[in-house]
């Protein structure tokens, strides 16, 4: 696999994470660069790990993973998207109270769940990489760095979008997550038909 192919693969594998990051950035009140980089690191690490896991599982697990990876991604993204829509429909006092009562680690767990949901199909890509002449460590590093940069940019781009549309930004973020999940499900089901 050529270096250019690896870089293109890295960017292609991070597009779902980029779209989710735009939604996340739009939903955040005032994301700072630190918030954007944190999201980029979480998504980048997860996106780098999942193809390695897939690569290790190899050909034996590919049929099993292909049978349900799209349902897992759809379910996680749908649930997170619905949660964001409900939160976006709450009035300000309910949102402030919920934020006060929500532990800090939930934010990281929700971020990690979104990162996993957008990268689960990367595991299947990792399975296919097991049959190619590639160094999985290099591929994982490139995928992780591409995702880090795209998610960081996506959160900040979402911030600008969020400033333009205000409270509806969280609803938009939820819709984006649901659309990503639905697209993943549609692509897998239409490919299987």
From Swiss-Prot:
Subcellular location(s) of the protein: Cell inner membrane
- Bilayer topology term: Multi-pass membrane protein
Report the transmembrane regions from the record: 3-23, 37-57, 66-86, 109-131, 146-166, 171-191
Instruction: Quote a single Gene Ontology cellular component term.
Output: plasma membrane
Is the keyword Cell inner membrane assigned to this protein? yes
Task: Kindly list any coiled-coil regions of this protein.
Answer: none
Q: What GO molecular function terms would the record report?
A: manganese ion transmembrane transporter activity
- Lineage: superkingdom: Bacteria
Classification via Pfam families: Mntp
Function text = Probably functions as a manganese efflux pump.
Q: Which PANTHER family match?
A: MANGANESE EFFLUX PUMP MNTP-RELATED
**HAMAP family on file:** MntP_pump
Question: What's this protein's name?
Answer: Putative manganese efflux pump MntP
Q: What is the lineage of its organism?
A: Bacteria, Pseudomonadati, Pseudomonadota, Gammaproteobacteria, Lysobacterales
Gene name, per UniProt, is mntP
């Amino acid at each position: 696999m050529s270096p250019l192919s690896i870089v293109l693969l890295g960017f292609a594998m991070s597009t779902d994470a980029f779209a989710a990051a735009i939604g996340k950035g739009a939903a955040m009140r005032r994301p700072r660069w630190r918030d954007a980089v944190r999201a980029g690191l979480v998504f980048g690490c997860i996106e780098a790990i999942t193809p390695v896991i897939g690569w290790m599982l190899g050909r034996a697990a590919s049929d099993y993973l292909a049978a349900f990876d799209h349902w897992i991604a759809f379910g996680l993204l749908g649930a997170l998207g619905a949660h964001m829509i409900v939160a976006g429909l709450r009035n300000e006092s309910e949102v402030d109270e919920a934020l006060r009562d929500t532990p800090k680690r939930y934010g990281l767990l929700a971020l990690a769940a979104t990162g996993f949901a957008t990268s689960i199909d990367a595991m299947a890509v990792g399975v296919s990489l097991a049959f190619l002449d590639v160094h999985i460590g290099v591929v994982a590093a490139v995928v992780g760095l591409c995702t880090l940069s795209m998610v960081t940019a996506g959160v900040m781009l979402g911030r600008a979008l969020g400033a333009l549309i205000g409270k509806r930004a969280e609803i938009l973020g939820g819709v984006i997550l649901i659309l990503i999940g639905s697209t993943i499900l549609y692509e897998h089901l239409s490919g299987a038909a």
